[in-house]
From Swiss-Prot:
The gene is ef1b. Belongs to the EF-1-beta/EF-1-delta family. Keywords: Elongation factor, Protein biosynthesis. Promotes the exchange of GDP for GTP in EF-1-alpha/GDP, thus allowing the regeneration of EF-1-alpha/GTP that could then be used to form the ternary complex EF-1-alpha/GTP/AAtRNA. Pfam families: EF1_GNE. It comes from the Archaea. Signal peptide: none annotated. InterPro entries: eEF-1beta-like_sf, EF1B_bsu/dsu_GNE, Transl_elong_EF1B/ribsomal_bS6, Transl_elong_EF1B_B_arc. NCBIfam families: aEF-1_beta (TIGR00489), PRK00435.1 (NF001670). It comes from Methanococcus maripaludis (strain C6 / ATCC BAA-1332). GO terms for molecular function: translation elongation factor activity. This is Elongation factor 1-beta.
Amino acid sequence: MATVIAKVKVMPTSPEVEKEALKETLKELVEKNDAKCRGVSDEPLAFGLYTVFVMVEMEEKEGGMDPIEEAMNALENVESAEVVELSLV
């Protein structure tokens, strides 16, 4: 099987969401889903709001990134999470 690298864009619900705590939660979530977190970064958006990007490495399988994306969207302090880049290694 091939290895997949995905870049997931995560939008927090508000600027008050603690950035470092959110990053740590996302890392733990990725690892609980049998994947590796290859990096977490953030970029400022506007008015104190920021976007978090998570790089995920996993083996290609049925359903792909759907379980991880759904789990991220289910987090209390996450407005949205979506895969913005996907490539095979």
